[in-house]
Amino acid sequence: MLHEGLHTEEDFQRIRDKKAAGEEPWISAYQLLVESQFSQKTADTYPTEWIKRGVSGDENYMNAARGATIVYQQALRWKIEQDDEYAAKAVENLNKWVQTCVGVTGNTNLSLAAGLYGYEFAIAGELLRDYGGWDRADFAAFQNWLLKVFYPANDDFLKRHHDTNALHYWANWCLCNIAAKMAIGIVTDRRDIYNEGIAHLQTGDTNGRLRLSLIHI
């Protein structure tokens, strides 16, 4: 697998160059990231044993949503500013999730949680894979965590879609699970999983298939 994920080194170098030159609109856009509460070196995440979405009175999925956002933004600042303190904090936050979270649960909405946050955690981890301070055993644990916690739910939704008609769910449900499969496949070096996502995008039976999802844009 090619390990550039969502962003390439050329992307990051272009951002660094625009930032160094103080060019607009790039510098103002970057300032929004700098000012984000989630991108700070001190930003902590609060993992839960179960990510719950669609559980009346007991939902906590925003912990995962914020957690993935924090790690992603910290990873972005590390790649752009090349300050290892951002990467160290991002890895600390990811390790907390790996050590704490064992699954995703809820009603049918658990499939949104698995797709959205599985994708977001995976792309954040991919950004950090080359950080020398991420112990290789911890990185392997992160890879296994994605495969255990998110991938089964992604796969089940795209195959079974909660025992409904294949076209029952709007495209966003399917597309986030496709994106999660592709991102997880890349960061875990599982081309078979990546190919599953591509195959569903091209020929799947749900509204995540491009020929069906495009009409909803």
For the regions a protein language model found, what residue spans apply to each?
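Long, repeat-rich segments with strong aromatic
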Residues: I186-L214
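Extracellular glycan-targeting catalytic surfaces
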Residues: M1-D163, L175, A179, A199-Q202, ...
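Loop-centered beta-sheet repeat module
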Residues: L167-G185, R191
